[in-house]
Amino acid sequence: MNIVDQQTFRDAMSCMGAAVNIITTDGPAGRAGFTASAVCSVTDTPPTLLVCLNRGASVWPVFNENRTLCVNTLSAGQESLSNLFGGKTPMEHRFAAARWQTGVTGCPQLGEALVSFDCRISQVVSVGTHDILFCAIEAIHRHATPYGLVWFDRSYHALMRPAC
């Protein structure tokens, strides 16, 4: 069996563009958030998406206990917020950097996100270092922001959408 090494895999994955998201939660274990591009649709019946989260991440215990999350898809111009949530910045400073509303699950929704998916974690599957969180969508909030934000070739890029 031919095993692909980690660096080759990462280099190849940099060729796959992906939306930039801030994943948030709030509940009994507290408030937390992180930046993720490993998010995708699973099915529309029932509406479900998945989020991949490293079990070694400092936020993992909070998401694991709260069992709710909000996927906030970023707009162009929110790169600094993505960097803030992708680093070691304390949670209170991350959340202080933007306007948030509370979603139906109690999770923070980013006021200026392109779209927010408010979810309950319905199933968790562990693969390697990560948990795959299957998320049943309870509410969706779209915003009239004209530009999306993607991560491609290890940098941010803006995409203009033709209509909302």
Curated annotation (Swiss-Prot):
It comes from the Bacteria. The keyword Flavoprotein applies. It catalyses: FMNH2 + NAD(+) = FMN + NADH + 2 H(+). Induction: Up-regulated by the nitrogen regulatory protein C (NtrC also called GlnG) and repressed by RutR. GO terms for molecular function: FMN binding; FMN reductase (NADH) activity; FMN reductase [NAD(P)H] activity; riboflavin reductase (NADPH) activity. InterPro entries: Flavin_Rdtase-like_dom (IPR002563), NADH-dep_flavin_reductase (IPR050268), RutF (IPR019917), Split_barrel_FMN-bd (IPR012349). Keywords: Flavoprotein, FMN, NAD, Oxidoreductase. One of its GO terms (biological process) is uracil catabolic process. Its EC number is 1.5.1.42. Pfam families: Flavin_Reduct (PF01613). The keyword Zinc-finger does not apply. PANTHER family: FLAVIN REDUCTASE, FMN REDUCTASE (NADH) RUTF. HAMAP family: RutF (MF_00833). Belongs to the non-flavoprotein flavin reductase family. RutF subfamily. Catalyzes the reduction of FMN to FMNH2 which is used to reduce pyrimidine by RutA via the Rut pathway. This is FMN reductase (NADH) RutF.
